Amino acid sequence: MTQAKAIVAVVLLALLPQLLHSDFILTMFVFAFILGMLAISFNLIFGFTGQLSMFHAAAFGLSAYITHIAMTSLAVSFWVGLLIAAGAMFVLSAVIGTICFRYKLKEFYFAVVTLAFAEMARLVVLNWNSMTNGSIGIAVTEKPMLWWPGRGLLAVAGTPMWYYLSLVALVIVIAVCSRIVKSWMGRCFEAIRLNDELAGTLGINVFRYKLLSFTIGNVIAAVAGAFYAFYIGYIEPDYLSIAQSLAIVSMVLLGGRESIIGPVIGAFILTALPHAIRLNAELRLLVYGLILILTILLMPRGIFGTFMRRRQPNVAATPVTPAANALKAKP
């Protein structure tokens, strides 16, 4: 997507609340924006670096709990609580990543170990009743405070305000991740995804860049988790569940993991679909599983990747180059 098209898309989305007076549709967009951030952050680890992390849902859910606990226990604002949660995820991700990457875990083994850490986090949340309220969850009544042009400092309450806040956050995440992917760091990610052993022989510090990808992705997931919980006003252990991890993987594979925009498309579809056909929680898992199977079999590049491939039949959506070519032209 060119810069001009991106600007037009953002302007149209900014005008949408003025054109549509449906709170239901705006609510779907808010969820899609927040889950779009989550999908992009996962794709940074999975799509661009080739690491199938099953800890992502845990980072998403833990951040919601930490933000709320910081606000209530330390009497700080939402934004300070979010910084504390992001910092906690940075440290926790660095520890988990160091353990995994020092032992050179990858593919199936990396997925299993990160899943084990995620399940440990879920069990802590589920059983630490004094802090998390266990399986009952926490009702969130606090609101983020934000300065609005012409209106001063206001609590972010109501769907229209959350719409603009989540849209701005999504645009920032897209811009930051696009910059990362196009940078020298992004080329190192690509080289590691293609062949991490060859990347190491070319002088890339594989441990360092895998750890960077894992940590950055989880910190962005932490932001998405806090936004999600404070928008719906409730936090529960299911945020850290395997079902949530499956949903994240489905978003990325459906939209396409070879781009930044692809996961956002997947998030929009999987946000709207369950509400459009009135699916309950159990049927959603079945749908996510079917989507994973059909996408892998019929559209391995995802919706966005398949569209770009058909639009430019002689050029892949993201050129698949040897690891050595991925490192040309160091800035």
Residue ranges of model-derived segments:
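Extracellular/periplasmic helix-loop junction at the C-terminal end of a transmembrane helix
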Residues: 117-155, 304-306
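Alpha-helical transmembrane segments within multi-pass membrane transporters and channels
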Residues: 74-117, 265-267
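Membrane-interfacial amphipathic/re-entrant helices at transmembrane-helix boundaries
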Residues: 1-37, 75-81, 322-331
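Transmembrane alpha-helical segments in multi-pass inner-membrane proteins
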Residues: 57, 210-298
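Single transmembrane alpha-helix segments in multi-pass membrane proteins
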Residues: 17, 22-74, 99-109, 189-191, ...
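Helix-loop-helix "hairpin" substructures at the membrane interface of multi-pass membrane proteins
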Residues: 157-236, 330-331
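Hydrophobic alpha-helical transmembrane segments
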Residues: 3-8, 28-29, 33, 58, ...
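Cytosolic-side transmembrane-helix boundaries in multi-pass membrane proteins
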Residues: 1-14, 139, 194-196, 201-208, ...
